[in-house]
A protein has these predicted regions:
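Non-catalytic beta-strand/loop surface segments
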Residues: 2-32, 67-121, 145-177
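Non-catalytic, conformational "gating/processing" segments within enzyme and secreted inhibitor domains
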Residues: 58, 106-142
Length: 177
């Protein structure tokens, strides 16, 4: 994608992103002397997001979903999450369901982005040959341009009541008939 190409051209390595139940992360390792350029490029991806590669990224996610169907560890983990967190969002697959991946709407993605990708929900972690006192002004200059918005209201879920012991079994893997 364009962001990866840009930061890799300045020496970044390990450019990646990932999502879990409660968070998304973006990671890259880059030379300390490129900090100003990295701050500008990274802040721009939130100031002026480009969803041009939406379809190709979606295809990557769908392919990841398909690969996960053959992964016994993932299948076991998903089974445990479904049973342990029944009725809670943690019971759902992080990557989504095929019906969500087959017919997504860009408008829904943008709506989600605008609701949740707000400064109050973001944390920037920098590690390496940098001094916080020297860099904090540049961080504020780059990311301080993000418009402050109230954090979205979060749904409150009831604590799961676990009473007694439950036992579930599942076959995972290849079992010939």
């Amino acid at each position: 994608n364009e962001y990866s190409n840009l930061v890799e051209s300045m020496g970044a390595k390990g450019v990646n992103a990932g999502t879990y139940y409660d968070w998304t992360f973006y990671h890259s390792s880059f030379p300390a002397y490129q900090i100003n350029k990295w701050l500008e490029i990274s802040s721009q991806r939130f100031l002026h997001p480009v969803f041009r590669s939406f379809q190709s990224e979606l295809e990557n996610v769908y392919e990841e979903y398909n690969r996960s169907q053959d992964d016994q560890g993932r299948a076991q983990n998903q089974f445990v999450m479904e049973k342990a967190f029944e009725g809670h969002p943690y019971s759902r697959s992080i990557i989504g369901l095929p019906e969500h991946l087959k017919n997504p709407r860009l408008s829904k993605l943008i709506e989600f982005y605008e609701q949740w990708y707000v400064p109050e929900n973001m944390v920037l972690v920098l590690v390496g040959n940098i001094k916080a006192q020297q860099i904090s002004g540049r961080i504020n200059a780059a990311f301080g341009r993000l418009a402050a918005k109230p954090s979205p209201e979060r749904k409150v879920y009831q604590n799961l009541e676990i009473k007694g012991r439950k036992q579930h079994s599942a076959k995972v893997g290849f079992y010939p008939q």
